[in-house]
């Protein structure tokens, strides 16, 4: 009887160990939103990785697609122009959103992807469509000083600072091949927020 009890407890321990490992390895929340407007379709797929400790709370990867039959027709016919070139460059688009909580409004002056120190970084605002997006070589981190006039303020509540990093298609394809995502965010106060996690992107059809 005692032997049966022993093996029973052992099996329970093995099961619990597998369960917690499984939960840890699948710490990604997936969501898909589809919106339609007349004959146009907007699709957002989000993959959210939650951090347990520190002010860096989450990393969200976003794949966005915009389907416009008229522009798609022009794209397939290899036509050029302001709108069709922007559509070709940014459909689909790939973004990382980083959420950092603090009692202040933060700016981020630098983003470093380990292994890609020579990547071309732009710092223009996230406004589409724009000829700037057609010229995007590496990634864009936005204007780090857009909220500079608020940097000196401290608030009696938590401020959710979101940094959006837009990746070019070529840079995204390089990121997908990494085994781990090692990223450093540098704030306007020179504080570093470091990320070192398993690269979950190859697990999905992106």
UniProtKB/Swiss-Prot annotation:
Give the main localization category.
membrane
Protein's cellular compartments? Cell outer membrane
Among Pfam families, the record links this protein to: BPTA
Transmembrane intervals = none
**Quick check: keyword Signal in the entry?**
yes
The UniProt keywords, alphabetically, are: Cell outer membrane, Membrane, Signal, Virulence
* Region forming the signal peptide: 1-23
Q: Which domain of life is it from?
A: Bacteria
What is a single cellular component term in the Gene Ontology annotation? cell outer membrane
Q: Does the keyword Transferase apply?
A: no
Q: Which InterPro entries match?
A: BptA (IPR031471)
- What is this protein's function? Virulence-associated protein essential for survival of the bacterium within the tick host and therefore within the natural life cycle of the spirochete.
Family membership noted in the UniProt record: Belongs to the BptA family.
Q: What is this protein called?
A: Protein BptA
What would be the name of the gene that encodes this protein? bptA
């Amino acid at each position: 009887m005692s032997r049966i009890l022993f093996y029973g407890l052992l099996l329970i321990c093995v099961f619990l160990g597998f369960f917690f490992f499984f939960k840890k390895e699948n710490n990604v929340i997936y969501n898909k939103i589809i919106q339609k407007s007349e004959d146009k379709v907007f699709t957002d797929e989000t993959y959210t990785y939650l951090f347990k400790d520190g002010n860096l709370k989450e990393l969200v990867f976003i794949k966005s697609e915009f389907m416009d039959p008229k522009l798609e027709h022009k794209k397939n016919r290899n036509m050029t122009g302001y709108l069709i070139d922007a559509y070709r460059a940014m459909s689909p688009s790939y973004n990382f959103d980083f959420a950092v909580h603090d009692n202040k409004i933060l700016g981020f002056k630098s983003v470093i992807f380990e292994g890609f120190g020579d990547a071309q970084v732009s710092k223009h605002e996230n406004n589409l469509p724009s000829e700037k997006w057609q010229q995007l070589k590496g990634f864009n981190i936005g204007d780090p000083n857009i909220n500079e006039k608020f940097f000196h303020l401290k608030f009696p509540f938590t401020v959710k600072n979101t940094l959006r990093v837009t990746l070019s298609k070529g840079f995204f394809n390089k990121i997908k091949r990494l085994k781990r995502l090692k990223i450093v965010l540098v704030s306007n106060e020179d504080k570093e927020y470091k990320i070192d996690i398993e690269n979950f992107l190859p697990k999905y059809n992106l």
